[in-house]
A protein has these predicted regions:
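Short, polar/acidic, helix-capping and beta-turn segments at strand->helix junctions
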Residues: 1-254
Length: 254
């Protein structure tokens, strides 16, 4: 397992990425990750209050907050996404998680996508995850991966980094999906896991990827727990395909 930074107040390690989110999180020994989905997604301000109340009720501090899944009305421009993220991290800073600076620290994993139908009128929180003391000494490891789209690592602007930009042909989609799957595998390995540890695999796209599910996903073991396909777009204009994976210890609906 690669040596990853550890967010000690939250009892989880994380893949350092960009200021708005990490590449994924995994519970440290002696802890595990629980996931809660809201029965009805909540506007962010209400969601933050609900998260605080839930963590307080189970005896956990806000620093146990490890991941969230958001839904936005429509894909952002690069500047719009940056502005949204600047506001988003303010709550994480208040919770004692995010640290500003020349090299900002944000250990929290995140997925943010835009439903094609039943769009929210403002950004909402769909689900969140946090660490708790493990219920069993031999508890299996638990982790949450951030959402990842078909953009190579780089600067703030996405357009120049998108794989097969504006190409939604069968072969264009094949390359996009293959790129994202490779990135999911890389993150899993960094966290100390593999496809065999994944409990839930989720895809987000409005493009037809049916011809790729067997060949690219199931054949490599990415769908052992099935595939959850959300008819939604990634959060930035130009992106067509996003995925995330997780292996939570337990999941609840609130």
């Amino acid at each position: 397992m690669a040596e990853l930074p550890v967010f000690e107040p939250g009892s989880y390690r994380y893949i350092k990425a960009v200021f708005q989110y990490s590449g994924g999180v995994a519970a440290q020994p002696g802890y595990e990750i629980e996931r809660v989905r809201f029965a009805k997604p909540l506007p962010l301000r209400e969601a933050y209050a609900a998260v605080e109340a839930h963590l307080k009720a189970i005896g956990r501090r806000t620093t146990a907050f490890a991941a969230c899944e958001l839904r936005s009305p429509d894909p952002f421009t690069d500047q719009g996404f940056y502005d949204f993220n600047q506001t988003y991290v303010q709550t994480l800073e208040r919770w004692g998680i995010y640290k500003h600076g020349d090299d900002p620290v944000n250990p929290v994993a995140r997925t943010n996508v835009c439903p094609m139908y039943d769009k929210p009128v403002e950004p909402v929180m769909y689900a969140f995850s946090y660490t708790v003391p493990a219920q069993r000494i031999a508890s299996r490891g638990s982790f949450i991966g951030s959402g990842g789209g078909e953009a190579r690592a780089g600067g703030r602007e996405y357009r120049g980094r998108i794989v097969r930009l504006e190409d939604t042909s069968p072969e264009g989609l094949r390359e996009k999906v293959a790129f994202v799957l490779a990135e999911m595998e890389r993150r899993l390995a960094l966290l100390g896991f593999s496809w065999s540890d994944v409990v839930t695999t989720q895809a987000y796209t409005v493009q037809n990827i049916g011809h790729l599910v067997g060949e690219l996903m199931a054949a490599r073991g990415a769908c052992q727990g099935g595939l959850v396909w959300y008819y939604a777009r990634p959060p930035v204009i130009g992106l067509e395909y996003e995925m995330d994976v997780r292996g939570a210890a337990r999941e609840f609906v609130l």
